[in-house]
């Protein structure tokens, strides 16, 4: 999670210091009251795997005790899960008779959630709440099965900041309820694109709940439903087909935002690479037996932070724009989010990779601040910000996204290397706080309980911190140490020693109220399709970390007879654990290192664990591996800080009335704008009568009807919600008229939901709509 994810906590700590002990006692009492029970998710079907090391990567007694604790089954945990008879696992003949390819299904579904009154997840900037929508967010699912239909794998790329453990556990639970053991922990990967402009509020660990300003069950349930629907669509639409792979570089769209950390890696290692970022894009092309397009998965290392932390519109950022362009091209005649072709631009080892290619500059003087501490002579680190290539963040998003789309399109068109061979999968739950890491045949070290360093609070050049923390800090500060110690208690000597040279700002692994602040139990997972291996990474690997893991996994496969494997780093998968740097980068303690929560040997631990998964697949011993300790599922979480209130229209007006109409005439390239009497858009998550907040419609004289030309998923539209006092609000719809717009008569429509509550009665959500007067678009 890039950039200043903890400014909310900084404000929280300062507030507590000022208000002194009385407020502290009250808050702690509240946290204890809100503490809920813990449920562990039991086996969801199939084999779930842990690994052993040679020498072993051992799990300590704490993990063993946790895994044997008597707790409730998750089969009864979710009251919202649809309980249906499991789908029988049967070969899908005669579809596959005399066929040697794969059975392929693709699906896409909306998972947008709230677009107002919720914090945007990624920057952690206090007050960066959603206030409208630029594009919809989607879950894109791809199912690949062997010819008899029984052995299959699922890859899902989701337009969210990252996959939370709670989200994955709930999805797996509902998949089990519907499909039995067909879709399981080991063969389903959930990956977040890492957009920093999606809603937060879907986490269960306290650090992320604070950054989200509470848990939003509405958004959580909408995300779960969207992910499941995309998998259902892919499952229903499976057909015989072929998969091809292609690779190629994408130039001019990324820089390393921590080059001084990268330089800590051995010169001999750096000399093997021409760049301090991974420029290679890997593309999977999926077609049916007639050669008709089905879908694309692309993996490329880039942070979706072209939209900066001043943005308040929900959107999928640069990678989402790339998906938008390719899907619109392949699904001609369909509105965005519709049509059979599905294109996912998935995340990879993007930890230190920025799309803001103009680099860091002091915004007050214009001079470069590309230094070890990312700080400016005047104003310090808060003035050091990197910018993208465009005139504004919208333009930069399009430029970077279009470049990725164009390269993926080229690689897709020229893909000729077919992916063949059996499918396999391996998964393990691991206690990452207690892994023995073998440095060589005789010496070992261990991972640590989670902790965040001082440079974490500094943020990055993509989104700086609110207080004057600096990257590259290897010493603490007495002022902040005192605040932390008074409110949270002192970190133990053990955790301080384990994390050196990181100066600990927050000893999250030793904080457990109202729930643990960070996860202990983490997923590691590999899926293979013939000669392709997809490693599901539970966080953000830096460039060199990804390179080392790829090489190690590839070498492990090769040592057991699986030569020439292509290993993909798939980022932000299954559970979020911040960053993973190399041991050498960790010593520099910039943002990424300070956010490597399990200590300096985190990468080495992951390399051991993923090598053992690769070995199990290569030697066909996956079934012999244990599943590992089970993660918790917390039932009660802190509610959102922003309450729901009744919507009100101005006197003499009603919801959807036009307050400011569009002008009578516009030229292409101009912006048509209409302002309506609005209501809180978060109501639409509860009552989904309408599937869009807006439409732009063109009058067709031949049919004497209005035809929709774009909606709120279209890049050229923007929906802004302006919150007033006492339930009053306005909604502004903008249509940035593209050069491709046909001349003619148009109108703009607004669709919303208002919250109404009569005295002594429960609140109800009512739908409404508004329509602007017609206006003309001309090309001259």
Curated annotation (Swiss-Prot):
Lumenal compartment residues: 34-780
Residues modified by glycosylation: 62, 67-68, 70, 73-74, 76, 78-80, 82, 84, 98, 151, 217, 308, 440, 468, 564, 730, 779
Recorded consequence of changing residue 124 to R: Loss of ceramide hydrolase activity
TM stretches of this protein: 13-33
Post-translational modification: Proteolytic cleavage of the N-terminus removes the signal-anchor and produces a soluble form of the protein. N-glycosylated. Required for enzyme activity.
Record protein name field: Neutral ceramidase
Cofactor: Zn(2+)
Binding residues for Zn(2+): 194, 303, 540, 579
GO molecular function: calcium ion binding; N-acylsphingosine amidohydrolase activity; zinc ion binding
Keywords associated with the record: Apoptosis, Calcium, Cell membrane, Disulfide bond, Glycoprotein, Golgi apparatus, Hydrolase, Lipid metabolism, Membrane, Metal-binding, Mitochondrion, Phosphoprotein, Secreted, Signal-anchor, Sphingolipid metabolism, Transmembrane, Transmembrane helix, Ubl conjugation, Zinc
Pathway: Lipid metabolism; sphingolipid metabolism
């Amino acid at each position: 999670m890039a950039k200043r994810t903890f400014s909310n906590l900084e404000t929280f700590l300062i507030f507590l210091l000022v208000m002194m002990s009385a407020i502290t006692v009250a808050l702690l009492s509240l946290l204890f009251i809100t503490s809920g029970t813990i449920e562990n998710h039991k086996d969801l079907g199939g084999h779930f795997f842990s690994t052993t090391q040679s020498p072993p990567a051992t799990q300590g007694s704490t993990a063993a005790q946790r895994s044997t604790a008597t707790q409730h089954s998750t089969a009864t945990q979710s009251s919202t899960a649809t309980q249906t008879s499991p789908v029988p696992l049967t070969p899908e003949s005669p579809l596959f008779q005399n066929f040697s390819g794969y059975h392929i299904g693709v699906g896409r579904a909306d998972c947008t959630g709230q677009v107002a009154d919720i914090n945007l997840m990624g920057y952690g900037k206090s007050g960066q709440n959603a206030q409208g929508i630029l594009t919809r967010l989607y879950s894109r699912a791809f199912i690949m099965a062997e010819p008899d239909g029984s052995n299959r794998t699922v890859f899902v790329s989701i337009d969210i900041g990252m996959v939370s453990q709670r989200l994955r556990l709930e999805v797996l639970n509902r998949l089990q309820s519907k499909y039995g053991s067909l879709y399981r922990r080991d063969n389903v990967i959930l990956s977040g694109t890492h957009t920093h402009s999606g809603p937060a509020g879907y986490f269960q660990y306290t650090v992320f709940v604070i950054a989200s300003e509470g848990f939003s069950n509405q958004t959580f349930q909408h995300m779960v439903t969207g992910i499941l629907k995309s998998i259902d669509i892919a499952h229903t639409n499976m057909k015989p087909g072929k998969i091809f792979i292609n690779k190629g570089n994408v130039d001019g769209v990324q820089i390393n935002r921590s080059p001084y950390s990268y330089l800590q890696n051995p010169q001999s290692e750096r000399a093997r690479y021409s760049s301090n970022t991974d420029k290679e894009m890997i593309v999977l092309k999926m077609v049916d037996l007639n050669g008709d397009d089905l879908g694309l998965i692309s993996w490329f290392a880039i942070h979706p932070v072209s939209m900066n932390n001043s943005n308040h519109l929900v959107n999928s950022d640069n990678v989402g724009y790339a998906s938008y362009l390719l899907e619109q091209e392949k699904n001609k005649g369909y509105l965005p989010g519709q049509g059979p072709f599905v294109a996912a631009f998935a995340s990879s080892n993007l930890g230190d990779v920025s799309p803001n290619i103009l680099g860091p500059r002091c915004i007050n003087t214009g001079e470069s601040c590309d230094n070890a501490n990312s700080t400016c002579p005047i104003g310090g680190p808060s003035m050091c910000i990197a910018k993208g290539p465009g005139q504004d963040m919208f333009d930069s998003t399009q430029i970077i996204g279009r470049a990725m789309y164009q390269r993926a399109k080229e690689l897709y068109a020229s893909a000729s290397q077919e992916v063949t061979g059996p499918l396999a999968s391996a998964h393990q739950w691991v206690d990452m706080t207690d892994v023995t890491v073998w440095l060589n045949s005789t010496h070992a070290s261990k991972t640590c309980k989670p902790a965040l360093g001082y440079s974490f609070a500094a943020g990055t050049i993509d989104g700086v911190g609110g207080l004057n923390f600096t990257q590259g800090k290897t010493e603490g500060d007495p002022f902040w140490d005192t605040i932390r110690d008074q409110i949270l208690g002192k970190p133990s000597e053990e955790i301080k020693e384990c994390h050196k040279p990181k100066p600990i700002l927050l000893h999250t692994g030793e904080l457990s109220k109202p729930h643990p602040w960070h996860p202990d139990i983490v997923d590691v997972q590999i899926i293979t399709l013939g000669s392709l291996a997809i490693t599901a990474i539970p966080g953000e690997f830096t460039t060199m970390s990804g390179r080392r893991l790829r090489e190690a996994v590839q070498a492990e496969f090769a040592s057991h007879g699986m030569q020439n494997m292509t290993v993909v780093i798939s980022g932000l998968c299954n559970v979020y654990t911040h960053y993973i740097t190399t041991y050498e980068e960790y010593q520099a303690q910039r943002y990424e290192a300070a956010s490597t929560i399990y200590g300096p040997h985190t990468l080495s631990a992951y390399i051991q664990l993923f090598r053992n998964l690769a070995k199990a697949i290569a030697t066909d011993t996956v079934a012999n591996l244990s599943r590992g300790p089970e993660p918790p599922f917390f039932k009660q979480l802190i509610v959102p800080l922003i309450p729901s209130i009744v919507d009100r229209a101005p006197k003499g007006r009603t919801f959807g009335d036009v307050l400011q109409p569009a002008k009578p005439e516009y030229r292409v390239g101009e912006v048509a704008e209409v302002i309506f009497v609005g209501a809180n858009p978060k109501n639409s998550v509860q009552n989904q009568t309408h599937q869009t907040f807006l439409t732009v419609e063109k009058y067709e004289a031949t049919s004497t009807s209005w035809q929709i030309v774009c909606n709120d998923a279209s890049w050229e539209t923007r929906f802004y919600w302006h919150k007033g006092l006492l339930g009053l609000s306005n909604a502004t719809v903008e249509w940035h008229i593209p050069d491709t717009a046909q001349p003619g008569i148009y109108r703009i429509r607004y669709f919303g939901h208002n919250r109404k509550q009569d005295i002594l009665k429960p609140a109800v959500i009512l739908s409404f709509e508004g329509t602007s007067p017609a206006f003309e678009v001309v090309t001259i």
